[in-house]
Amino acid sequence: MPTPMTPVKVGALACQRNSFLFDGFKTLVVSCEPTKNKKGEIEGYEIELQDTILFPEGGGQPSDSGFLKIVEGNRNSSKIEKILVSHVSRFGLHAKHHVNDYIEPGTTVEVAVDEQKRMDYMQQHTGQHLLSAILERNYKVDTVSWSMGGIITKKKPVLEPSDYFNYIELNRKLTLDEITNVSDEINQLIINFPQEIIVEERIGEETVDEVSTSKIPDDYDLSKGVLRTIHIGDIDSNPCCGTHLKCTSQIGSILILSNQSAVRGSNSRLYFMCGKRVSLYAKSVNKILLDSKNLLSCSETQISEKITRQTKQIQQLNKREQYWIKRLARTASEELMNTLKASGKKRAYFMEEEYGTLELLLQIHKEVSNFLKDDTEGYEIILCGYERQTNTGSLLILSESGEKIANLAANLGSILQNLKGGGGKKGGKWQGKITSISNAEFAALSDYLSHDFASC
């Protein structure tokens, strides 16, 4: 047994000995070390406890999150404080709890785990063991790796319903019949023939000939640690450090998708989810179906047909729009060139006040460029588009002179507060975007183009 200030090794943690211990667990703080960012500033602390019911990330299972309640130590013991543990990481045989507050080593804390998250993770993880075991036993299909879905990250703080699916990578693609049969058998083992799940622990150099240790992490010293083997009835025996259910009935249900993704040659990813996720997924998908029915004014079975029909209509409308954009651009460019020639001032502008998209302005620029390519004399052209529905706009300034472009951009910038753009330092094209425009600014812009700019 470890001494009071000697931490229990990963493999024999309280969360691994009893995965249903969710709160009320008291232990000691062994160490509390600061973590620093790239600037050397303290951004948090890593705490190692004498023992813990918070599982450190490993075995394809994310870490738990939870709280530490200070019950005595360097703070007022009469006031219990809750400190959030955002995640727990493993360093060799040690579990490190990531927190924002310093806790004095020797302090007694009470640990609580996020029970809902733990149960969800166990349902997915135990479900994966059972799924892989059935595939290997019945079809000789090997699980190469697996990944748990439904994990919120900084890169993806909001998850789509499909993000909650886990996947196992297999050494070949399954047929639809195989997926159906596997689903039926697993649901039988959940509902009608539940299997007891037992965790066997071996310490140090005990013989483990019947269990492969090839997937034990390289940084886990098995000679000093604990080898945990998860037995699901007589169906499966596999080494695993994760937390698991006590019986297959606790998996609740399993949903396996028929669509698979090809990866690494002939390998395939099979997507599945277990337990409460299945009902939550059904609710979210049902809402999407109801919303789609209402928006499309059709029944569920007609949604696909309706979307296909509308997609074709949109494609046809896009083709028509492109045709008329080119026609309008050609006409506008001819008018611009006529204005340049007639005025003798080499200044002209175009303004569209309703559907003045950047696409239209760029097409006009393309047409105008064909006229200007052989013109060596000076010119200044402003193309302005306003989209009334979004209250945004676009601007192009064309000139052979970078100085002229800069002057015009400055003038327009003094009128339009939210105009930003660039380019044309050596002549050519300056392109800008107006993120929003007031009525007063729009009136001032119109006045500038028709009077100040055109009459100079």
Swiss-Prot record:
Zn(2+) binds at H125, H129, C240, H244. It comes from the Eukaryota. Binds 1 zinc ion per subunit. SUPFAM superfamilies: ThrRS/AlaRS common domain (SSF55186), Translation proteins (SSF50447). Keywords: Metal-binding, Protein biosynthesis, Zinc. Its cofactor is Zn(2+). The keyword Acetylation does not apply. GO terms for biological process: aminoacyl-tRNA metabolism involved in translational fidelity; regulation of translational fidelity; translation; tRNA aminoacylation. One of its GO terms (cellular component) is cytoplasm. One of its GO terms (molecular function) is ATP binding. Belongs to the class-II aminoacyl-tRNA synthetase family. Alax-L subfamily. This is Putative alanyl-tRNA editing protein alaX. It comes from Saccharomyces cerevisiae (strain ATCC 204508 / S288c).
